[in-house]
Amino acid sequence: RWLCRCKYCRGFGVQSPSAYSFIRYVINEHYPYYAYSELEERYEMPSRLQHKLGRLLFRLANYWQPEKCYSIESLYFPYINAGCHKSVICNLYDLYDSSTKNLVVIDLDHIDKDELYSSILPFCNESTLLVVLGLNHGKNKQFWHRLQYSEYTGITYNLYYAGIVFFDKSKYKQHYQVNF
């Protein structure tokens, strides 16, 4: 199974320079960041995968530098705040401010997918970065495919356990499979 995923490692085969850079230096960055050891000591994660996702959210917050972070999952807030100190944590259902840079983190196991599609996605724009957790379950995979081909979304990255969605319509719509 691991050998089948090898072709999706470290940005191999990605032609877009910006997508390659994002995959290589944000998603699959392996160098230890300044806050990793402190976060490990202060906040205990229930599983190794959740710790890995916390590190990913740290790197995404560091890359995107959002002014606001919207989520209902509080487990990852310390990682997001460590990645971007200026970011303010807000309730997911208060996502109506499209003038600021936003990071939206959603766990598909803890949210109504139809409500997400009808109530939250219309407020996402090019200043929004959406992170979708819990993709590796049957119905969640179906929703992810629906989300990828939605008129709202732009470039998407499927990391098997999580998905990342950009809403910039000025770029050609692409879907990348990334071994995370």
Walk through the language-model features, giving the residues of each:
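Glycine-centered, small-residue-biased loops immediately flanking beta-strands
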Residues: 128
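A short alpha-helical cap/connector motif
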Residues: 1-125, 136-180
